[in-house]
């Protein structure tokens, strides 16, 4: 699993290469017949990976907030790169004395701040249960555009899904 981020970077680089001049174009961009349900190219795989494994980030009246579960990592770093990228890095090393084993884990995640958010105002907090929260306050002018209203909930009194027994009951009564 450690090589997965490197694999995605390689895939992105390959996607930028000229497509027709490569003898491997068909291999990387045209799926075999048996893979009808699989993504069509590396960009789709990268988008799927981003959507599937991206931590929940929210933008609300308090600002931009990103949460990560890092309870298994002891060495944590949060850095700001290029005034718009937040880099989160975590390491964990464990040594078992009984069996002489050693395990090491490392992650590196990059997040691009939404446009207009100031990187120098990034703050991070770590809760006692291992949740890292990265926050950035809303830039001036954004708070006026974020409107909140409460929506009333109307109860229908009917089930959303019809039970499987209803068709049998009707057939039995006929």
Curated annotation (Swiss-Prot):
Residue segments, region Disordered: 152-174
SUPFAM superfamilies: HSP20-like chaperones (SSF49764)
GO MF, any single term: unfolded protein binding
Residues with the Phosphothreonine modification: 152
Record PROSITE patterns: SHSP (PS01031)
UniProt keyword Phosphoprotein present: yes
Family per similarity comment: Belongs to the small heat shock protein (HSP20) family.
Protein's name in the database: Heat shock protein 22
Organism: Drosophila melanogaster
